[in-house]
Structures are given as C-alpha cells and as structure tokens.
A protein has these predicted regions:
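Metal-centered catalytic cores of metalloenzymes
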Residues: 2-120, 124-238, 342
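Primary mode marks residue(s) on the alpha4-beta5-alpha5 output face of response regulator receiver
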Residues: 209-231, 238-351
Length: 351
C-alpha cells in the first residue's frame, strides 16, 4: 500500500470512529492503535497447556503467505460458568487476525470499549462451548514493539483504541494443521482484569481471497450494524404457494457505511462509504449460525467506487456474529414486503 495513502486511509478510519461516537453508534469501526497490560487468570474456560510454545516475539511475522484467519470478538459470545469468574463485557469489541506459517503463529488484535488485556488466547471449542487453551499470546502483552497506526512511537498513550501484534512458536504439528484446516473449531479470547473469565471472544474464520503483508493486518477493520433490516418480498415458491424471499438489505454500519443491494432483487450486496469508496460482494461461502439468525458469510469484494478512501483496498468481507434477520416463515400475500431487524459485524479485509 502507498505510504501516503495508507496514512490518509487510517485518518479516515479514525474520523469514522469519532463521527460514529458523536452520533451514539455503539458498534463502530475498530481502528489500529496500541496498548498493553498485565496478565491475569483465565478461569472459566477449560484448562490447556498452550501446546508447543517455545518462544515469543513482540513483532508480527512479515510478508505474505501462510494461512490467515480472522475473528470478530464480542462480549455476548462468552460462555459463563456457574460460580466462575466474570465474563462478557457488553461494551467491548475486538477484531483479531492470526497467521499460521510453518511453526510460527502471528497475531494482530485491536480492541475498544474494554480494558487492557491481561491474557490473550486461542482456545479449541465450538461456538457456545468453552475449550482448552491451545495458543497463549500472553507473553506478548507489554512487549508491543511493532506499534501500528497514528500513535506509532507514542507508547501506550493512544486513547481511541488499542492493539497488540506479535509472534509465537508452536511445535505441535497436529495443532497447526487443525488451525489451518478447521479454524471454526477454535476461538480467540481476550481477558481483562474486570472480566478474568473472558471479556470478548469470537470464532476464527479463514481469509480466502485477500492477500496482504501481515504487518499491515490492522489496516483492515471491523464495522458493525448500527441499524439494519433484511428485506423480504412474498414471491411464488418452488413447489407452489408463496413464501418470503430476499429482496434487499438496508443497513447503516459504524463509520456510516451504507449497505444495500445494488438494486432490489439483484442479489448483489454493496457497501458505500461516505467518501465515495465502495464495493460489491459475491458470496464465497455461508456458515449457519442458528435457526433464528441469518448465516455468516465470506464474500469476495469488487471495487465499485472511488479509488481512494475507506473501502478502496477492500478485497474480502466477512459477515460475522449475526443476530436475527431471518425471513418470516409460513404463507404470505403475494407482493408483501417486510423488513426484519438484524445485527452483524462486517470485517473489511484489504487485498
């Protein structure tokens, strides 16, 4: 990425956060800054031995290549244990990237709305369950030598966001292979002093299209739905009768990114930033997320707006942590249109 434009783009991201906060947007863009903290307990999750870690570095591994994973962390994803320590910071959020290359596992995480991390792990466990620690990034906390963003060189003084990058060595080949081939069976978890059992967590997902130098991982960002509806129209159904089918989507994301179809019934989603940069999306894969929630998506992004701006480098989009938005069931009156509220996190990844 051009250095001058990279600085301009980061400025745009920060501006988007400030605008969203002023407008009362609770879930806005997660920017890339840096801060640290001290370790604490992680009781409340099954134990583990952080298999195979033999060394740690405060700098994320450079270069492309390897398997890149992403997670959008929310307090609502935490699973409490009866009698266990506090979990689930309802105000917290984080976006995390992980790269597995050889025996090196790199992490880049940015958080907001929650305290400084006291522990940072990858656990093995499905959504809704607690699992053992498999990779422990705790040794990187307080060693953030690779600061990213406008606050580079200013230590831990960033007030608009915090981030951490680094690399650990893992010698367990079976674990490394499982991370690469079945990432959704693992989750990222960030602990704080207030929530020692886990403040925010999110399942890992493979980044399939976008290619970027992992040192620039936190140039990617997360924007959550501030207000949105999945829009359905009653249409003839296969096998006879009528049923609701997708007509459109209408949503405003953090940073005031507008989300809709390029035209009703087109089936092609688009995201338009206030600066005129924009992308359309084509679904690569769908992951069910419960009967009451629309599926999570991996989408290939195609540029459709200005060549400079917030979305100008976006090559892939992950729709994660979906809540609601499912089409009404049963019969309906032909032509009827309904909007079903939904929530989701969108992770915009550069190519």
């Amino acid at each position: 990425m051009n250095a001058t434009f990279s600085k301009r783009r980061k400025s745009l991201i920060v501006t988007a956060v400030a605008v969203a906060a002023a407008g009362g947007v609770a879930a806005a863009v997660v920017p890339a800054f840096a801060a640290g903290g001290a370790r604490a307990d992680h009781a409340g999750h099954a134990g583990g031995d952080a298999q195979g870690i033999v060394s740690r570095s405060g700098t994320a591994a450079a270069g492309a290549g390897g398997t890149v994973l992403a997670a959008s962390l929310r307090g609502a994803n935490e699973v409490p244990v009866a009698g266990g320590p506090a979990v689930g910071d309802k105000d917290g959020a984080a976006v995390q990237f992980v790269k597995v290359k050889g025996d090196k596992v790199s992490v880049a995480v940015a958080w907001r709305g929650t305290g400084k991390p006291t522990a940072l792990h990858i656990h093995q466990g499905a959504k809704g369950t607690n699992g053992g620690i498999k990779v422990d990034f705790g040794g990187l906390i307080g060693k953030e030598s690779g600061l990213i963003g406008k606050e580079k060189g200013k230590g831990n003084g960033a007030s608009k966001g915090h981030s951490l990058t680094g690399t650990v060595t893992v010698k367990d080949r079976a674990l490394l292979n499982a991370l690469k081939t079945d990432p959704s069976s693992f989750y990222a978890n960030l602990h704080t002093a207030e929530f020692p059992g886990g403040a925010v967590r999110g399942q890992l997902h493979k980044v399939t299209v976008a290619k970027f130098d992992f040192r620039d991982a936190l140039d990617n960002f997360q924007a959550s739905v501030f207000k949105g509806k999945q829009i359905y129209e009653c249409k003839p159904a296969e096998g006879g009768g009528y049923a609701f089918a997708q007509r459109d989507v209408s949503a405003v994301l953090g940073g005031r990114i507008a989300h809709s179809f390029v035209a009703p019934n087109s089936g092609t989603p688009q995201w338009i930033a206030r600066d005129g940069s924009a992308v359309t999306g084509a679904v690569l894969s769908k992951t069910p997320n419960g009967e009451r929630n629309i599926p999570e998506l991996d989408l290939k992004a195609t540029q459709s707006g200005k060549h400079r701006g917030l979305l100008a480098d976006t090559a892939e989009i992950l729709r994660l942590n979906t809540v609601g938005g499912v089409a009404p069931a049963g019969s309906c009156t032909a032509g009827a249109i309904v909007g079903v509220p939904y929530q989701a996190d969108y992770v915009f990844i550069n190519g």
